[in-house]
From Swiss-Prot:
Belongs to the GatB/GatE family. GatB subfamily. This is Aspartyl/glutamyl-tRNA(Asn/Gln) amidotransferase subunit B. It comes from the Bacteria. It catalyses: L-glutamyl-tRNA(Gln) + L-glutamine + ATP + H2O = L-glutaminyl-tRNA(Gln) + L-glutamate + ADP + phosphate + H(+); L-aspartyl-tRNA(Asn) + L-glutamine + ATP + H2O = L-asparaginyl-tRNA(Asn) + L-glutamate + ADP + phosphate + 2 H(+). Allows the formation of correctly charged Asn-tRNA(Asn) or Gln-tRNA(Gln) through the transamidation of misacylated Asp-tRNA(Asn) or Glu-tRNA(Gln) in organisms which lack either or both of asparaginyl-tRNA or glutaminyl-tRNA synthetases. The reaction takes place in the presence of glutamine and ATP through an activated phospho-Asp-tRNA(Asn) or phospho-Glu-tRNA(Gln). Coiled coil: none annotated. It comes from Streptococcus equi subsp. zooepidemicus (strain MGCS10565).
Amino acid sequence: MNFETIIGLEVHVELNTNSKIFSPSSAHFGEDPNASTNVIDWSFPGVLPVMNKGVIDAGIKAALALNMSIHQHMHFDRKNYFYPDNPKAYQISQFDEPIGYNGWIDITLEDGSTKKIRIERAHLEEDAGKNTHGTDGYSYVDLNRQGVPLIEIVSEADMRSPEEAYAYLTALKEIIQYTGISDVKMEEGSMRVDANISLRPYGQEAFGTKTELKNLNSFSNVRKGLEFEVERQAKILRSGGVIRQETRRYDEASKGTILMRVKEGAADYRYFPEPDLPLFEIDDAWIEDMRAELPRFPAERRVSYIKDLGLSAYDAGQLTATKALSDFFEQAVALGGDAKQVSNWLQGEVAQFLNAEGKTIDQLALTPDSLVEMIAIIADGTISSKIAKKVFVHLAKHGGSARAYVEKAGLVQISDPAVLIPIIHQVFADNEAAVADFKSGKRNADKAFTGFLMKATKGQANPQIAQQLLAQELQKLLD
């Protein structure tokens, strides 16, 4: 029997506000334990939450970016549960009226086809703290993360393969990153994924019993965990077994999933409206103000790069991987840079430099105008492509004008025959053995002279002109 895979994803995204959702404590990552806390985070008696407007701004932007409807009469709810990292014994979240609902995004699969994935809801909530279990037998609670603003984005169960889940996460991360509301760094916990997966026989309408997957710390692990679950559940069903409703975690060492707990039924969190926060009215003007702050999103940019600039789909995809890279590219083209040449540099030397330095493009001293200027002085013969790589490294580290640096550093390409011919004659004089080989008929010996000349000019000889002049002067040796 063959089975259809049913996947839905829940994605928690930390919003990059300066302060927490209901307290003035810093929301920044990496502080010493409990350094970013105050009486609200510790839930001292009598303290009250104060709404951070920037969180609602971010929620509106996310909802618009994900093609969602917005609840304009929005409230918060209490989600009741006890855990040491939750000192109030409840979490302030949203239940029946999330800020966004009924959305969708398009995903692109590996074969180039596209699919629309529906999004059920996006709701705002506060994050919990973090428990650490020490080797000394004690458990420690760090409340720095308590109250950090989150938006949870819940998809419909529209994905039918691990590949589609991977594509959905890739597209979702791109969109959220473009809005500027989060850096979506999984390694820092600002994007966290839970997956729900079930199988059903083809043709059956009802969903099968789902398994929830946790500990998915990369998109690759999401895909691997789901692939393992497809095989595990199919094997059980084909042998006549029954799938239990479980929570499992992905284990990188075994490349499989491990049981965490069996779910007997749905958790009863006893939601009720948060009495310490008012109803929030989100009027049309507020929504339009947030819409005006949104950029062009990657899908629209890719279409433009292909249609208007003549780039390949691959190049367009690479250039829109991050908003910073895409903005840099567009600024360079607007300054007169050739789209294909700018693209080649960004995907070649620039990408290699960023990877080696562990930086992003907005951390470089290189500016779009200096890159365009460098491309121009390659085209007009001022420098060679080889010298340009050296120039680029300087600009990436120190910035400034490409032409000014080339002139100051003495890197201008030598193209004048009146300068090159005497150097060629000196090369002949310094390499008599090679000249003798050439004269004796060893025609391949002429290739050595190119290297000798480039060494003598420190790589500054114009390659095309140098080759022409070498051929001319070598011929004279035979005449």
